[in-house]
Amino acid sequence: MSEVRLPPLRALDDFVLGSARLAAPDPGDPQRWCHRVINNLLYYQTNYLLCFGISLALAGYIRPLHTLLSALVVVVALGVLVWAAETRAAVRRCRRSHPAACLAAVLAISLFILWAVGGAFTFLLSITAPVFLILLHASLRLRNLKNKIENKIESIGLKRTPMGLLLEALGQEQEAGS
């Protein structure tokens, strides 16, 4: 296995401006929609990481303790999901067949915990909103040839990226590159 590397930052023109082609996904074909989202998450991961980082930095500047607590709760909740999927077959099957529901459950549990300690608004602003916008962009952005080639390289294991490892931990490794 090769080392984990962050792919290059994609041009703003490719990401959201001129050459970016957006279209609503077909809700009648959820498998194709899932492939589009996963492949866009892999291809634009550096751009998404930058957007998420800016959002976290802004929220951290405004409410540092709640932002840190929000990030910690989400990391722990994701860790529990990965651990449960590794030790229990039923959770593993659920994680593979319903990844959106698992992500929603992690975010809902995190929101409930943070609501109890008074940090729900910061959580919604610093974590949930950027995740929603990233998933919205990944759902709407049509793939181009360069995107497909990069995803094939990732899927055959010639190149490892942080998003590829995260998707693998969430049980979506078989979807990537399709």
Swiss-Prot record:
Keyword annotations from UniProtKB, A to Z: Endosome, Membrane, Protein transport, Transmembrane, Transmembrane helix, Transport
Assigned GO CC terms: endosome membrane; GABA-ergic synapse; glutamatergic synapse; postsynapse; presynapse
Main localization category: membrane
InterPro entries: Prenylated_rab_accept_PRA1
Top-rank lineage group of the source organism: Eukaryota
Extracellular membrane side: 63-64, 120-122
Membrane-crossing segments per the record: 42-62, 65-85, 97-119, 123-140
Membrane topology (UniProt): Multi-pass membrane protein
Subcellular location: Endosome membrane
Single GO biological process annotation from the record: protein transport
Cytoplasmic side: 1-41, 86-96, 141-178
UniProt similarity note: Belongs to the PRA1 family.
Summary of the function given for this chain in its UniProt record: May be involved in ER/Golgi transport and vesicular traffic. Plays a proapoptotic role in cerulenin-induced neuroblastoma apoptosis.
Subunit structure: Interacts with CCR5 and GDE1.
Name of the protein: PRA1 family protein 2
